[in-house]
Swiss-Prot record:
NCBIfam families: PRK01222.1-1. The keyword Phosphoprotein does not apply. CDD domains: PRAI. It comes from Bradyrhizobium sp. (strain ORS 278). Belongs to the TrpF family. The lineage of its organism: Bacteria, Pseudomonadati, Pseudomonadota, Alphaproteobacteria, Hyphomicrobiales. This is N-(5'-phosphoribosyl)anthranilate isomerase. SUPFAM superfamilies: Ribulose-phoshate binding barrel (SSF51366). Keywords: Amino-acid biosynthesis, Aromatic amino acid biosynthesis, Isomerase, Tryptophan biosynthesis.
Length: 219
């Protein structure tokens, strides 16, 4: 299976085009006001139209309420919901039933003990995203540029596709794929000049490095 590449936190037509033209399979839009990558509904509508038919559109939320989800789904028409908060299994099941969309649940990882909830999530989620656990005083759960010990996932047995994120860049994505055997990689801060400001060349370089990692993994 080919490696999926997701560029998350896109906010401008130029950086979105860079991701699409370089072959990203997924493009992520953040709907969380504390994040420097947050997009409003008007911008999301325009970016969604730009990405339509070229990549899967992913809506990232953090413990959003029903009204927020309804606005996002109506405006962006996402292909996948990414839940990055403390959403319960019951909440995830309700969202899937309500909107008829697949769900990717983010699981914050620092040690192997953080993998304990996986059994429950795997029963209801379509995909799992492993991200570095944020510090206790962080104002947002991801996009902080921190990595986690990828060796925690070495012995992982999961009957759902999974991706890795957290501090990925063109310099370390190959090592992350080699160790975790992940089916996809997700980057945000690793392709930015400053928080929330994506760089087109960094996006292209990351995708190029991910493709090289993919080739090595099948040799």
């Amino acid at each position: 299976m080919s490696l999926l590449v997701k560029i998350c936190g896109l906010t401008t037509p130029e950086t979105l085009d860079a991701a699409l033209d370089a072959g990203a399979e997924m493009v992520g839009f953040v709907f969380f006001p504390p994040s420097p990558r947050h997009v409003g509904l008007t911008a999301a509508r325009e970016l969604g139209q730009q990405a339509k038919g070229r990549a899967l559109k992913v809506a990232l939320t953090v413990d959003a309420d029903d009204a927020t989800f309804e606005n996002i789904v109506e405006t962006l028409r996402p292909d996948l919901l990414q839940l990055h908060g403390r959403e319960s299994i019951a909440r995830i099941r309700d969202l899937k039933q309500r909107f008829g969309l697949p769900v990717m649940k983010a699981v914050a990882v620092a040690t192997s003990a953080d993998l304990a909830p996986l059994a429950g999530y795997a029963d209801v989620c379509d995909r799992i995203l492993f991200d570095a656990r944020a510090p206790k005083d962080a104002t947002r759960p991801g996009g902080l540029g921190a990595t986690f010990d990828w060796h925690v996932l070495e012995a992982l047995k999961l009957d759902r596709p999974f991706m890795v994120s957290g501090g990925l860049s063109a310099d370390n994505v190959a090592e992350a794929v080699r160790i975790t055997r992940a089916g996809g990689v997700d980057v945000s801060s690793g392709v930015e000049r400053t928080p929330g400001v994506k760089d087109c060349d960094m996006i292209r370089n990351f995708i190029r490095a991910a493709r090289a990692a993919e080739e090595l993994s099948v040799q």
